[in-house]
Amino acid sequence: MDAWKEITKTTENDGVSTCSLSSIAFDPYSELVWTGHKNGQIKSSFGPSLTSYTQFIGHEGPVHQVLPQERGVFSLSSKSLRLSNRKGTIRWRYQDSDCIDYRAMFYQSRNNPEVVIGGYHQKLTVVNAERGISIHKDKNVSDIFIMRRNRLLCCGSTNGEIILRDPNSFQPVNKVVAHTGTISDIDTSGNLLLSCGYSLRHGTYMLDPFVKVWDLRNLSSLVPIPFPAGPTIIRMHPKLSTTAVVCSCSGQFHIVDTGNPLDAKLMQIPLTSYLTGMDIASTGDAMVFTDVEDNIHLWSPLENPSFSDLKLPIQLPNTSTETVQLENNDPLNSIGLPYYKDELLSSWSKYLIFDVGKPILDSNLLIAKQISENSHPVPQEIKSFHRNQIIEVPWLNRKLISEGATPKFHSERQKDIMSGNDIEGSASYFEEIEDTISGPDSIPKFYQRPVIKYSKFGIEDFDFGFYNKTKYAGLETDITNSYCNSVLQLLSYVPSFSKAAISHSLGPCDLMECLLCELGFLFAMLKESTGRNCQATNFLRAFSNSSFAQSLGIVFDDYSDGTFPDSFVIQKFTKFMLTEISRIADYEDKKDGTSFPVSFLLKSFCIPEMQTYRCGICGITSQKIKSSLYIIDLHYPSQQLESILSFEWLFKMSLDRRVDLPPGWCEYCLAHQPFLLRSFIRSLPDCLFINTQVKHHEHWKLWARKNWLPKKLHLRRVNDTMQCVSQKISNLDKDQQSLSVYVLRGIIYEIRQNGEEPHFVSTIRVSDNTSSDNPDDNRWYIFNDFLVKEVTEEEALTVHGPWKIPIIVYYEKLDTKIPQWDEVSDYTLLYQPYSLNKNPPINKIQPLTTDEMLYPKMLVGIDSEFVALQQEETEVRSDGTKSTIKPSKLSLARVSVLRGEGPNKGLPFIDDYVATDDKVTDYLTEYSGIHPGDLDPDRSPYNVVPLKVAYKKLRLLVNAGCIFVGHGLQKDFRIINLLVPPEQVVDTVDLFFLSSRQRKLSLKFLAWYLLDEEIQLTEHDSIEDALTALKLYDCYDKLKSQGKLEETLDNIYEVGRRFKFRPPSVASMSLEDRNSYGDESVISNQTN
């Protein structure tokens, strides 16, 4: 408040008469200041410079009050009420022959907007604001000098009384005797009523040296505000509900808090006369004063203040445009373009050029062709070319990147590269495709649902990298309930959430279906992926099995019943996840040794809420209930949504809600009385999740406003509740340390495309430093499943059209500090057996001993077996070709890990069969070696463990830096949902592979050719396959050290081609077959 200063001073004096200004008011809907004059003129000035905008004659006599509203500008004189538009054109005029002298008016917007007027004629009149006719009159009322509207209509009179009237019936409810003389001014804010006026002292009416303050709830008098200079004008601050501006006629004014009247800031307007009027802009950024000499003084703490929050555009007069002189050397960018709404032709994509076909031939030429079969009609434009000239047809050689382009499969791209047919100009990344600009009806492709295509080689052949050239991972969609991807992506970039989940997943946890552990595993993959696509298979499987989630209706079974997730399902899922964390925290509290990461995580988003029930008659609060929220729902008023000025106001109302309840029993009144339920937030955590609750188009229109969603939220605690203030108001707050600043970090949107089910995307500000102003630390990305793309901040925050609906908003407290704790991995599972079996299982392993500590680059052999939960879905086209609609759904059934070095090399230390509650459609026994009953802990003779245990063992090996040796590990790790860094994978299918042959060799064939071993004779055994992979790796090292690797690879493919890459029995090979490749056996030639 100390920074207030005069920034503009203008005069309305015409040089003939003085004291012509009679009223002044800011326009709450546009950047205008309105003034009324004693000669009936009404003027408006634009902007901080107070440039003249409009001027017109409104009345025959003095203009007592000007009241700008959305419908226009109301002006009141002694005999008439007029409504004009902002250009000065009259809409209607109201006059009453019985009126003596109108003095005050007030606009109230109900179902039918009305203007209430009063004056010195003992009559209160209500005029319809649309038609300008009287709809209600009250006679025999006291004189009304000034009116203010709050919960009650406050009418000040010349006898010192303030009559409080019901705003609906306009009947007197109560009255306050404020002064013994006339009232000078009154104003209201919230439950406060302030007045200043005259009192009789020593036989003379003198200004009271203080401002009187009342509480309208019980009409009790509060501590008055001292003002020795004598108050004549009072205005309550429109943003600070307890702050008042008190002015004297000498030009002094105080800015004072009614709760602390002694702490006032005194300022002086440089006047040579007396002050006659003042007003405060609805933004609170400017004040305007008028004096007897018709000067207008504009005060503000800003150099360029704003008068209106809405800033509706004003219509400027038409001006003739000058002819633009353009010379050859003049730059084109010096010539401006006219305003346009539609897209310019120059910005159309070159791919919007279409072939319209050949020109229409003349009918006479067609008749001529019928007469002579040897003649052919030729268009006249072609006849104009000579025979040695070439007609250029641009579309023949044009190479387009189709707007609906999809990436080529890896196999197709590799084939094109090998054959030299790779098309020049084909897109390597999604961002290279020509795309549209976001608009009310145009949906760019990066918002549309990306679709996975399948080839005969399965999903591994799909090029996910086409949709993501960033270092941040996307999530795949071919999984049941993958609608959760947008929420999972947002949570992964909440630092406290990600760190606590990963730490929890590494430690001991007894819950076998722990969603926090699954989140930790997923977040670790997303963190380490460096842009590779990931999938939330294990998390979504555990989520789908949750009975609590099923009861909430947020688990879907491949949408088989025709229902699809919508925005409210996403909001329910988010609330479910935060509630689930609370449940896990309660479980940890009951155990010995509470897990600090979980308790810290709960505090980071848990919101304490208080609910009170107050009797509407006796006013006694009868019950207080404390509860916890995890996400805040926005609550919109049922009517007059257009009156919501900002997101901060809406959020403030949602933090402190009041609801009228039906009558209940009051213990103090001993009767059934109406109750008021109040729900308010006492404090806010570091992580703030907000449900937008956009339920219909009127709600959406608020979010479509420009700059509706603030990048920062400023909150402070007032008494017992949290309040949200705008940034401008927060800058005026004297106690900056009491403010909490929250930074916008992410938004989840629902994308609606015509004819398709909705899907969800998240826009996230990916940054490790929320307080940084460095642009590199404030980059926004859109996560649309496996499509990830950097976007501008404007693109991320703007709601372009009805197809883009905000669902969840996430704010993070500025400078949030996450405590450091040791992320200690629990390796107990690797050293101690774990089993679900009721009977002791067959022991095929020797667990690691304390002497066999894991270390980086330690070799381990691995192989996995899988069962099918869902068969492949295919379709046969009319040409006989078959395409995959959906691949088979596989689940981990067995995993074996062997020591790859040391004295116990080849000895397994993990051989787990994985229990599953899902229905197995095919055990794939021929390829997996799994039989019915092997995965049932009650019947299986083998060691059966939960999926979480098997997965965590592998995760621990990855974290320890072990190198996995196996055959076809890419597909195995994908189904297991385990991300292993490439440097920790040795895949024998790639070691013995020639890209020029375009065929990868089976483990069975390589073992026959290189090791002289026959494996997989009956069924697959993961221990045998893992051991074989270790031997092949040793063979590879030996061949490479001898310099025979390339020669051996060529021979392998030659032999494979002869035997169709199927190993025959060595004993059954004829002598001719053996000798055709040398004097010695085929195998011995390669191994010696």
UniProtKB/Swiss-Prot annotation:
Localization per Swiss-Prot or TrEMBL: Cytoplasm
Start and end residues of each Exonuclease domain: 860-1033
Repeat positions for WD: 16-56, 136-175, 178-224, 270-309
Region (Linker): 309-443
InterPro entries per record: Exonuclease_RNaseT/DNA_pol3, PAN2, PAN2-PAN3_catalytic_subunit, PAN2_N, PAN2_UCH_dom, Papain-like_cys_pep_sf, RNaseH-like_sf, RNaseH_sf
Keywords carried by this UniProt record: Cytoplasm, Exonuclease, Hydrolase, Metal-binding, mRNA processing, Nuclease, Repeat, WD repeat
Boundaries of every USP domain copy: 443-814
Known cofactor(s): a divalent metal cation
Main location: cytoplasm
Family note: Belongs to the peptidase C19 family. PAN2 subfamily.
Quaternary context: Forms a heterotrimer with an asymmetric homodimer of the regulatory subunit ppk26/pan3 to form the poly(A)-nuclease (PAN) deadenylation complex.
Function according to Swiss-Prot or TrEMBL: Catalytic subunit of the poly(A)-nuclease (PAN) deadenylation complex, one of two cytoplasmic mRNA deadenylases involved in mRNA turnover. PAN specifically shortens poly(A) tails of RNA and the activity is stimulated by poly(A)-binding protein pab1. PAN deadenylation is followed by rapid degradation of the shortened mRNA tails by the CCR4-NOT complex. Deadenylated mRNAs are then degraded by two alternative mechanisms, namely exosome-mediated 3'-5' exonucleolytic degradation, or deadenylation-dependent mRNA decaping and subsequent 5'-3' exonucleolytic degradation by xrn1.
Protein's name in the database: PAN2-PAN3 deadenylation complex catalytic subunit pan2
Source species taxonomy: Eukaryota, Fungi, Dikarya, Ascomycota, Taphrinomycotina
